Structures are given as C-alpha cells and as structure tokens.
Amino acid sequence: ILASKRGSQNVGIRIVENSIPSNFEPLRTFGWASISLIVKNLDEIITKINSSPFKMLCPIRTMNFNQGRIKLLDIIGIGSEVISLVEVLDANETNLPVPQCSIDRPFMVTLATRDIETTKNFYYNKLSIDKSPEVQSEIWPLSDAFQYNRDTTYALSKNLFGEKTFLELHEYPEDSTRRNLISGNLHPGICHITITLPKIDDLTLYWLTEPIQIESGAFKNCKQVTFFGATGELVELIEHKTEN
C-alpha cells in the first residue's frame, strides 16, 4: 500500500500485480475510471512525468471545483490506470485537503456509470453517501477516448465520501462497454476501492462471499467483504473501529 511520505496517511493506493487484456481501453468502459491526487505544483511535476513511464492524456487545464478553481493534469500509468493530478488555485478553498508534500494523498475516486441517478441512489441507500446535484461539464480525456469534440459535456456529480474525500460519478456515453478481465485476475486499471466502516453486518448488501478475517497487514483480524455496485464496480468493505 502506497501512502504519502510526508503528507496524510489516511488514504492510500494499493498496488496489485495483474494481467491486462490487450484490447483494454480504460476510458471507454464502465467501472472505476480514475483516482485524483492533491499536489502542490503541477508545473514542477510535469518535468518528472516527462522522464517517467507515465504518459500525459491531455494538456494541463483549469476548471471549477466546488466553490474554487483547480489546475488539472490527467496521466496514465503502466497498468493502464488513469490518475488526475490536481493543484488548488484558490487559497480559500476549504473543501479539498491541503498538500503537505509535492504529491500528496488521493482525495477523489471517479466511477464511470451507465445511469448517474441510479448509481447515486444505490450508494445513498446502501452506504448512506449523500447525493449531490448533477452538473454538465467537459471531460477532455473522455471525449478524446471516444473521439468526440472536447467541448462535449457529460453529466457528473461530486458526492462527499468522507472527510475531504469525494466520490465523483460520470455518466458515460451509450457506446461504453463492460470492463473485461482475464480469468483469475482482477479488472484492469483501477480495479476496486476499499472503504472502512464500523460495522459490516448493519448493511443490506449482497456479498460476493461470506465475510472473512484479514490475516495480516494494517487491518489484521478485521472482517472483510466485497460486493458489486450499481454498474458492476467492485467494492471492498473492511470493518474497522477507529480508536479515539
């Protein structure tokens, strides 16, 4: 599990070795589409990206986020994972975490969905994630993937997931497809997300398997289950009681 060295340790990224179908197109399929990391200075980071295995999907651009403005760069990694690097431009924007190092923690995960209203209702009813209004917005990497004009707009909503952490929903075009996988492997790209919560048994969800107990790592002896969401996305839940 990767976490920020000098920044927040509350949210991290788990790296899993996986086989990827040769025809996988990460931005043309339903499921977990990308993660967003909060950063300090995008212009400085670009020089490092240019000499790394990561590839830029679109030029840097500025856009609105909540009540402020952000600078955004989308990149793709060697596992076909899409990552958005976000620099906050407004000093008075308080809804996003403040980066404590050059590249800090994930603060948002994006889900590509068939129907945004159905997905919002699912996460509200099952995990009590509050619903937020939909807006129409340009999403350049998505338009590029489908060879649409970049001024094409899509329905999206940003839903508060936790403290300064968001679940963003994108309603994808009709010609999007299910995300295929190689038998015995996880879905390629961003394969799933993990959520910790105090009590799993209180939820009305259909588990893929019976709950198991984690045998090692940071959540040793904690209960764990997985389920599929409204668009077939994989979600892992870990029962973990935070100590005061």
Q: What are these model-predicted stretches?
A:
Residues 17-21, 33:
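Conserved donor-binding loop and adjoining core beta-sheet/short helix segment
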Residues 11-14, 36-37, 43-102, 111, ...:
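Vicinal oxygen chelate
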